[in-house]
């Protein structure tokens, strides 16, 4: 569809992160974290044509049945997008996340050395946390690609939907999409364990079953990367523990045993030019931290983080100051 292709091309030219399309409303773009409205008004008929262009028959049927849908899409130039379709006041809306075709390197993202070193781990659980649109997927993609370039491993990703597309290099990579290649994250994770993986990427720890399967995968000698929608390390630990009504002590012990690091991030506008840069909090799982988790003293994690600089830990305040000193923000 020519109109949609033109909108997507313009969004990329403006370096937008998201394209918002709603029937009988102006098209909006999110640029450098701010929503900007255009003068283009989209009709209900145009939205229907866009949906028919983006979705296949099965997806259209699921959308009609459920009223909302997540999927991946490639435009006429083969450029990728993550799409969410839902209803607002009885009308369909589309939000299209623009995904870069090339996976950025850790250096391009200015990832702290402690974060880059997570790609060298052999096993355990690494959590990457932050709000929606904070760059979690991009950080994980850079780490997975670093492993792909440098290590001879079998990497399996579970995503909903698939965003960045990897090409196997030193590693062998298989990407599985929830809803297409597997029914759910939890079911996919249990299946992955029978596929001889070394590294597993879980797009989101969205329920108790997925969290439990991820902990088991890390416990059985795999390196597991996963995301959570929390703003800080304490919130991430509590989110996992609060997912379980029973057996809380067992989960505390299991998490304390397998956790390697928690990386929390937010995007800040650059002071010069356009674009944003990630500001990080990095918590490394030392023996002392494992004891805090095991003993249920999660309220002390924030204080412990401040004193962990020698172990490579980083608070957002410290990293923000580093970014300011470099003239980035």
Show the residue positions of the predicted features.
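Short, flexible helix-loop junctions that flank or precede catalytic/ligand sites
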Residues: 2-329
